[in-house]
Regions:
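Extended intrinsically disordered or low-complexity regions, especially N/C-terminal cytosolic tails and loops
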Residues: 1-276
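Flexible secondary-structure boundary motifs
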Residues: 5-7, 282-346, 360
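Amphipathic, Lys/Arg-enriched alpha-helical patches that create a basic surface
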Residues: 12, 37, 43, 51, ...
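Short, flexible loop/turn elements at secondary-structure junctions
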Residues: 14, 357-361, 374-376
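Non-transmembrane, amphipathic alpha-helical segments
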Residues: 237, 274-288, 387
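Short, charged/polar, low-complexity loop and linker segments
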Residues: 268-277, 327-338, 375-379
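Functional cleft and adjacent loop/helix regions within the main domain
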Residues: 326-337, 351-352, 366-370, 381-385
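Histidine-centered, metal-coordinating catalytic motifs and their short helical/loop contexts
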Residues: 341-370
Length: 414
């Protein structure tokens, strides 16, 4: 809950801004925001050294990590104060308090996310000298960006046969996250479970129980499905999941703002402002991850076939070969009545996918509203950028849930 104060001037119109930046939970954070005068984007960066803490001269007993502030684009450090802008990497900023010099977004939004109710239930947070970590209380975990980097690096090194190097990064991933270092697939599975959170982990158990039932009901067909996955799809499927994690990391600063809200399935507050808005980088994220998910849900379709008393590759009206050629927007239809699979597919929106995949989306000037057309030529639709970020996070959670399913089948952990 530490806020640092910096002054910068816009590189386009020289308007001064006073930035009140909340220190987040990663070793660095970037914010891209519009100038209050000309509207052109400015970007700044804050590096945080959690290994080096300094004291406050006017607050005896309080410490904060040392930081390094730098400008990234279209602004420079200045001495004069300007319009106050509150920026927070982890929590949304309430619109009415965007320019309030006394506002603490983390406290305000943590209350919305139920942090204080959890404090009452978790007295350990007040024991001894333990620090109250609001971000962890509401479902986050520290150094998420760095942990994503370690996971992606280990995965990439493994794919190129650099096992010794991969193990080094798996060790880094495990530090302060797992009880010990684990092999790659176990690490991916455990990280994915942490990433999606407790509520979705419970939904994940229900899905895995369905898979266990399919295996018990017809083990021959279950292992035929597993063989089909291993022989025809495993490399492509896992590569797509790696790409999804990589895309998430590339757009981390924007996506993290809605991570907690999506993780808790919270309704987005209407009176909020974003602390980073790099829409150009993110406009194709939804479409890409939609493609990844719908290319892999044949596994759930196969499990549904077995549970329905059929061979894994036989649907009510087609076989698997035909199924793999139908429009991806329709690939969840064969199991639409098996609601235990809904958590993986209910976030799929083919209209938004078409617009995102074809780049047919535009963030309106001086606005938080995205307008888009399906396929670039369909009816005009609109969505707030905040809601778009929430949907992108929900898609990432769905991808992680599907990845867990694939790993459980791949490793024969069912």
């Amino acid at each position: 809950m530490v806020i640092n104060r910096y002054t910068v001037s816009c590189g386009t119109c020289q308007t001064n801004h006073t930035l009140r930046i909340s220190l987040g939970t990663d070793r660095y954070q970037e914010h891209t925001f519009p100038c209050v005068n000309c509207g052109e984007d400015m970007s700044v960066r804050l590096d945080i050294d959690f290994d080096d803490w300094g004291k406050f001269d006017n607050l005896p007993g309080f410490k904060a990590p040392k930081t390094k502030f730098s400008t990234v684009s279209n602004c420079e450090v200045c001495q004069a104060e300007g319009t106050v802008i509150n920026l927070d990497p982890n929590f949304l900023v309430t619109e009415n308090f965007l320019h309030d010099q006394y506002y603490f977004s983390s406290l305000h939004q943590a209350e919305r996310l139920g942090a204080f109710e959890r404090i009452e239930k978790t007295k350990d947070y007040f024991s001894g000298k333990q620090i109250l970590d609001i971000f962890s209380l509401v479902g986050g975990f520290r150094n998420l960006r760095e942990k994503l980097e370690f996971l992606i690096k280990a995965w990439s090194l493994h794919n190129r046969g650099k096992e010794n190097l991969a193990l080094e990064y798996l060790d880094k991933l495990a530090e302060d996250l797992f009880d010990k270092s684990y092999p790659l697939h176990e690490s991916i599975q455990m990280f994915s479970a942490l990433f999606i959170g407790e509520e979705r982990s419970e939904e994940m158990k229900t899905i895995l129980n369905e898979i266990k039932e399919a295996k018990s009901k017809n083990s021959l067909q279950y292992y035929n499905l597993r063989s089909y996955y291993l022989e025809e799809h495993v490399e492509d499927c896992l590569e797509r999941h790696l790409e999804s994690f990589t895309d998430y990391l590339k757009n981390y600063d924007d996506l993290l703002q809605l991570y907690l809200y999506a993780k808790q399935k919270q309704k987005i507050p209407e009176d909020i402002s974003l602390s980073s808005k790099r829409f150009r980088n993110l406009k194709m994220f939804y479409g890409n991850i939609y493609e990844h998910i719908t290319s892999s849900i044949f596994i759930l379709a196969g499990i549904n076939n077995i549970l329905s008393g059929r061979n894994f590759d036989m649907f009510e009206q087609m076989d698997l070969k035909k199924y793999m050629t139908i429009n991806k927007a329709n690939r969840a239809n064969p199991f639409k009545d098996r609601h235990s699979f809904d958590p993986v597919v209910k976030c799929l929106d083919s209209t938004l996918r078409n617009a995102s995949h074809h780049g047919a989306m535009k963030l309106q000037i001086n606005s938080n509203i995205i307008q888009y057309r399906s396929g670039g030529t369909g009816a005009l639709n609109s969505i707030s950028y905040t809601e778009y970020l929430q949907k992108c996070n929900e898609m990432m959670f769905s991808s992680c849930m599907l990845l867990i399913v694939e790993l459980m089948i791949l490793k024969n952990w069912i």
